[in-house]
From Swiss-Prot:
Cofactor: binding details: Binds 2 magnesium ions per subunit.
Organism: Pyrobaculum neutrophilum (strain DSM 2338 / JCM 9278 / NBRC 100436 / V24Sta) (Thermoproteus neutrophilus)
Protein name per the record: Ketol-acid reductoisomerase (NADP(+))
Keyword Magnesium: yes
Pathway: Amino-acid biosynthesis; L-isoleucine biosynthesis; L-isoleucine from 2-oxobutanoate: step 2/4; Amino-acid biosynthesis; L-valine biosynthesis; L-valine from pyruvate: step 2/4
Amino acid sequence: MAKIYTDKDASLEPLRGKTIAVIGYGIQGRAQALNLRDSGLKVIVGLRKGGNSWNVAASEGFEVYEVGEAVSRADVVMVLIPDMEQPKVWQSQIAPHLREGAVVDFAHGFNIHYGLIKPPKNVDVVMVAPKAPGRAVREEFLAGRGVPALVAVHQNYSGSALKYALAIAKGIGATRAGVIETTFAEETETDLIGEQTVLVGGLMELIKRGFEVLVEMGYQPEVAYFEVLNEAKLIMDLIWQRGIYGMLNGVSDTAKYGGLTVGPKIIDEEVKSKMKAAALRVKSGEFAKEWVEEYARGSPNLKRLMESVKEHPIEKVGAEMRKLLFG
């Protein structure tokens, strides 16, 4: 059974009087920095000199330093730059300036789990991973709520690493919603598997294939778009709010019967076995190796694949339909 922490299980006291350096001021970095400051904690920001985010962070009242300087001033270092940029920045600007006993926080376990970043033994290494985009992290905090998060400890030098992680989670508002204790391995692997087989890869391909079938059968592309893509949000909202069974009780009996009898024939045991094979590639590290090598080459395959999606007929029809819907 998962261990879930809420506001009553966490305290901001471990962070009182300490300096927190947020490295990166993108959507997630900005949200977490603002939330922590609004929680009464001292936050500075570490950025590349001359980057676009420097002036933004400064205009919002933060002391901004180059990354190495921010790290040298910090008791807590939150690494909130993109995954694939982290190893280089870590090696050149973070690791040389870390204080003994510092707390290093990540929002995703990829680089630690796959050994691309290897922290020294004399620091705590934790993860607080909000399960929502940065915009929601900020908006929910301002509304007096929070988004759920995962929390993990990779290295417990101080003996209090979990307390620090929970304090960070409380500071960004996550304990208001609930924080699940996990491991770097579990967070990383489930995140990648979920993205590839369901949330990004699986859902995207299911929608594209459904659109292709309807158009190839002679139905109007505009009608096909609404049926397989636009209405997907309505169904996902129901699932998010009520669960799968609750969603079924929110649609017609015809939709229920058709979905329950035909769905398993489409997403069958063969599909499940392919999903498991993809999951095993993640677990073995094969996917991470492939992606790191692809990124090092300048991501040519990713760029080609992105272009193919951009040119898919559903995108051309969708652009017109979204103009009708959203102006």
